[in-house]
C-alpha cells in the first residue's frame, strides 16, 4: 500500500454520467489531494495531509512541485501496427487529388497493406512498441489497436499476433481489434461479399482459436464495403461472439444506423452523420467516437460532437493514429482542437478520453479516480487542470503511473 501525492488538484472524473453534456462545474476536484493505492488499485482519494495522518506508517510516493493528477487516458481507436509511410498521400491530397486518384496512383490503404505484408513480425513489433511508448508518454495507458493492413489470412494473423506479443513488452493495456474488413484486397478474386464471407469462414475462426481479438471492425463506405453486405457481415461476426465496432459515416451518411441496429459497441468517425442519425445514435448505447486526427489529416469537417452530446449521446474521442488519414498520433492536441471547433467543455473532452472511451472498449474498471478503479494516472506540472487542453498538447505529461507504478 502507498500514498501518492500531494497534488495541487486531483480531477477524479468520478460521479459523472456516461452520456450527454457536461459542464466543468460538475467536475470533482480534490485540492491538495493524495491517492492511496494497493495492489494496483485505488483504495481512496482525499486530502493528502488527512490521508497521511490516517495511514501514518504508509510508504509515500512524493510528488514534487505543483502538479495536477487525472485518470490516465484511453485511446479507443488506432491503427498503429503498420509498415511504411504515406507522406506522398499527404502531398497528393494537398495538390488536389481525390481519394480515388491517390489510390490509383499507388497510395491509399492498399499501399500500407503492401508495406505491412512485407514487414517481418519483428519489424512490426519494434515499430508498434515505439508508437505505444509515444502514446504512453502522452498519458495514454489503454490503447486499442486494429489489424486491417494484412487483408489475407497470413498477414491479418501476423498483425494480431504482433499486437498480442507487444502486450508482453508493455504495461499499457492493449485491446486488439480485427479489421480484416478494411478494404477488399486487390489480390482477392471475388466480390466484396465473397471477401466478407471469407473473413467469416477463414479469418475469424482462427482469430478466435488463437484468442487474438474479441472485437471486429468494418469500414462501411462507398470505397470499401456497402451497407447491406456490411450488415450481414456484422450479424455473422456477432453470431461468432465478437463485439462490434464500425468505421461509420466518414464521407457518406447511413452506416451509423447500421452500427446502432446491430448493437455495435461504438460507431467511429461520423464526420458526415446527418441530424436524424445523430438523434438515433445518441439515444442508443453505441458510443459515438470522434476522430479529430482524421479530420485534421484529411482537411475534412469535424464530427458533430456538440450535437451528439446535446442529444444525449455517449461521446468518446480517439486518435485514429494511422499512416494515411491521421499520422499525428497526439490525442491531446487533437481533442483540444476538437474542443475549440465543436465548443466542448473541458469536462466533455476529459470524459471523452477517459471513462467514456474506456466504456467503448468495455472496460469499466478505469477512467475515473475512485475506490476500486485501476490506478492508472497521469500528472501534469501545472496548478490548474484547465491548462492541459488550453496548451493544446504542448504541456507535456509529467508522470504516468500504471497499476500505481511510475513508468
Ligand atoms: O480510420 N477510414 C478508414 N480507415 C482509416 C484510414 C486508414 C488508412 O488510410 O490507412 C481511418 O481513417
Ligand atoms: Fe480508423
Feature locations, PLM:
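N-terminal metal-binding scaffold of metallo-dependent hydrolase/deaminase domains
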Residues: 1-54, 385-387
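Short peripheral tails and domain-boundary helices/loops at the edges of structured domains
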Residues: 397-407
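Metal-associated gating/positioning segment near the N- to mid-region
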Residues: 60, 67-127
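Residue-level marker for buried hydrophobic side chains located in beta-strands
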Residues: 3, 72-74, 244, 317
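Divalent metal-coordination and catalytic microenvironments
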Residues: 7, 35, 40, 66, ...
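Active-site-adjacent C-terminal substructures of enzyme catalytic domains
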Residues: 243-244, 253-368, 380-382, 386-387, ...
Amino acid at each position: 500500500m502507498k500514498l501518492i501525492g500531494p497534488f495541487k488538484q486531483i480531477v477524479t472524473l468520478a460521479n459523472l454520467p456516461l452520456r450527454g453534456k457536461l459542464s466543468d462545474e460538475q467536475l470533482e476536484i480534490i485540492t491538495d489531494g493524495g491517492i492511496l493505492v494497493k495492489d494496483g488499485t485505488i483504495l481512496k482519494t482525499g486530502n493528502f495531509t488527512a490521508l497521511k495522518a490516517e495511514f501514518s506508517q504508509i510508504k509515500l510516493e512524493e510528488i514534487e512541485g505543483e502538479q495536477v493528477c487525472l485518470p490516465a487516458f484511453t485511446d479507443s481507436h488506432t491503427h498503429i501496427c503498420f509498415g511504411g509511410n504515406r507522406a506522398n498521400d499527404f502531398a497528393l491530397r494537398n495538390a488536389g487529388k481525390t481519394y480515388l486518384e491517390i489510390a490509383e496512383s499507388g497510395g491509399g490503404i492498399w499501399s500500407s497493406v503492401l508495406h505491412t505484408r512485407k514487414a517481418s513480425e519483428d519489424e512490426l513489433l519494434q515499430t508498434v512498441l515505439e508508437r505505444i511508448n509515444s502514446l504512453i508518454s502522452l498519458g495514454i495507458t489503454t490503447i486499442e489497436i486494429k489489424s486491417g493492413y494484412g487483408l489475407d489470412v497470413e498477414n491479418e494473423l501476423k498483425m494480431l499476433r504482433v499486437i498480442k506479443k507487444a502486450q508482453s513488452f508493455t504495461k499499457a493495456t492493449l485491446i486488439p481489434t480485427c479489421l480484416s474488413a478494411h478494404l477488399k484486397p486487390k489480390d482477392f478474386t471475388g466480390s466484396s461479399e465473397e471477401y466478407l464471407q471469407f473473413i467469416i469462414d477463414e479469418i475469424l475462426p482462427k482469430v478466435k482459436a488463437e484468442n487474438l481479438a474479441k472485437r471486429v471492425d468494418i469500414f462501411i463506405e462507398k470505397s470499401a464495403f456497402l451497407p447491406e453486405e456490411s450488415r450481414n457481415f456484422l450479424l455473422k461476426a456477432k453470431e461468432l461472439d465478437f463485439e462490434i465496432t464500425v468505421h461509420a459515416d466518414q464521407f457518406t451518411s447511413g452506416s451509423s444506423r447500421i452500427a446502432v441496429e446491430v448493437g455495435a459497441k461504438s460507431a467511429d468517425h461520423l464526420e458526415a452523420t446527418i441530424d436524424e442519425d445523430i438523434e438515433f445514435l445518441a439515444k442508443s448505447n453505441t458510443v459515438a467516437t470522434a476522430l479529430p486526427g482524421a479530420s485534421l489529416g484529411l482537411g475534412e469537417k469535424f464530427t458533430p460532437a456538440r450535437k451528439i452530446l446535446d442529444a444525449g449521446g455517449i461521446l468518446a474521442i480517439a486518435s485514429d493514429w494511422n499512416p494515411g488519414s491521421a499520422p499525428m498520433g497526439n490525442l491531446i492536441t487533437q481533442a483540444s482542437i476538437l474542443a475549440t471547433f465543436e465548443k466542448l467543455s473541458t469536462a466533455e473532452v476529459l470524459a471523452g478520453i477517459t471513462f467514456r472511451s474506456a466504456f467503448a472498449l468495455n472496460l469499466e474498471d478505469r477512467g475515473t479516480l475512485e475506490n476500486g478503479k485501476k490506478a492508472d494516472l497521469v500528472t501534469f506540472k501545472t496548478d490548474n487542470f484547465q491548462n492541459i487542453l488550453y496548451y493544446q498538447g504542448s504541456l507535456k505529461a509529467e508522470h504516468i503511473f500504471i497499476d500505481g507504478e511510475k513508468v
